[in-house]
Amino acid sequence: ARLIVQHIEYSPIDQYYDVSVFTQAAVQGCLGVNTMKADKHLYDHVRFDSRNEKTFMEKLEENDEIEAYVKLPNSFYIPTPMGKYHPDWAIVFKQKLSKYPYFIAETKASDSSLQDRRIEEAKIECAKKHFAKTNGGKLKYNKVSSFEELLKIVTQESV
């Protein structure tokens, strides 16, 4: 997979995801267990998949520099040679914080097998190449382990 990723290229096309990709029938979960109320999210309630995601969402909600965010649906993906890659979050920052008003964040926890992690890392490398070619310089993509790491990335790159 590493050799394929080294040579993969993405090119901008004139197609976009329709806003219906964010149409959601209902959040299915248990409030306080795997779902939480949200004010800055696209929806009133958000389901999280891990403790790391829950902590990340809480920090997004608390921080004044966050304009809005969305946990990206499974219907939003980037095609890669290793299969579909589903980024976790789309985040909109207030303009004064970063030169990148938009940020796509990957917050995967490392509790999967070595083989799964290698495949996921290859998909993440493809996503980096995808977003570098298709965003017009206004969007930053990165894997982050915490909200604090996200802030460090956007504030260092705005200097």
Spans of model-derived segments:
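Intrinsically disordered, low-complexity, repeat-rich regions
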Residues: A1-Y85, V92-V159
